Amino acid sequence: MQLHPEPRPHPETQAHPETQAHLETRGTRVRPGTPSLLRELNDRAALDLLLGGEMLTRSQISEYTGVSKVTVSQMLTRLEERGLVMIAGEQAGNRGPNAALYSVVPSSAYVAGLYVESDMVSAAVADVTGRRVADVSVNPNGADDPVEIVRGTVERVCARAGVEVGRLSALVIGSPGVVDPRTGEPRLAVNLPAWHEGALDALRGAWRKPVVIENDVNLAAMAERAAGAAVGADDFVLVWLGGGLGLATILGGKLHRGTAGAAGEIGYLPVHGAPLHTDIRHPASGGFQALAGASAVRTLAAEHGLAAPTAAEAVQAALSSGSRGAGFLDELAHRVAVGVASVCAVLDPGLVVLGGDVGKAGGTALADRVAAGVASIFPARPRVVPTGVPGEPVLRGAMLAAVAQARAVLLASVADPQ
């Protein structure tokens, strides 16, 4: 018996190449082995297909995996007995009875994703299909202990979802700052001083469940690639323009983190027109952050007669303020282009996505200006576009990563009972 499943890409796992270890059996032929091993691999192949989100008939699963319909029936029976697969409908046939349509049981696994900021924590719960069942936003009210913040938020969103906390298979937390790729521990989060080395161990000890902390901009890039402006792109950068500045780099379909996890901390990038940093604990003291960060954008807006409480609102006001707003947008785009051109000189990406509150607010008006600015100071002409992710991209990326992890756990749990 041979197993030869047809590759069927999942947007969630495409967004996270580093989590794809669970796909090792896909697209390969099984080596000769015991019947128990073959049953296990076949069951995993069928479950993997159904985790893609489609409802499939027995004949379709047979076609995709290359095994007989009789074997597929046995596979599905075993998966049904384990509560992983169910009959979800029927497909009308040209002849004979309708064919049963199989799907994964959505409640076979649940996950949670969080986006932790200094003044707000957003969270959501989804089932293993990726369907979001509840979300909440919580003001931490000055609390800074990671375990306290996460516990309170997760308990609240699980209560809203009607899901027991103990049923969560994975938890992914997005936060600003540097995350050590070797340990997974946060190392430098200026706005979240309590999120330092040891936070991940504390969270795992408290939850006794898989927990991942990831840089917020990296998660946003995963969301862009799965369902935003970078769908299908294997090489692109996401430039985050918000309260802080950040960069996520996807090269060859993989996220580039750097040796210490600091790749993308472009707020520290030395640029012309801004002083050098004197203290890395204060990013706004110099570099690109001092030129194009939120504080600098608000100051620039005031100089153009555009008073607004936030940088994003200043950009929105500029879009409807005629020539006065155009002058502000031109100068802002020039500043952003200086940083983007520096990135392009090293990476030469074909696509640059402008994200964050400012990038989203600026839309194509800002993106087109940045593209023109980059072209005037750099020989290549990358395509520059605004974010295409609806809603909160960091939280969406966290949910995608969590679902991918839950699916990996589910696939790994499939073992022959005999």
Model-derived features: positions:
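Phosphate-binding/catalytic loop of phosphoryl-transfer enzymes
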Residues: 114, 128, 170-286, 403-418
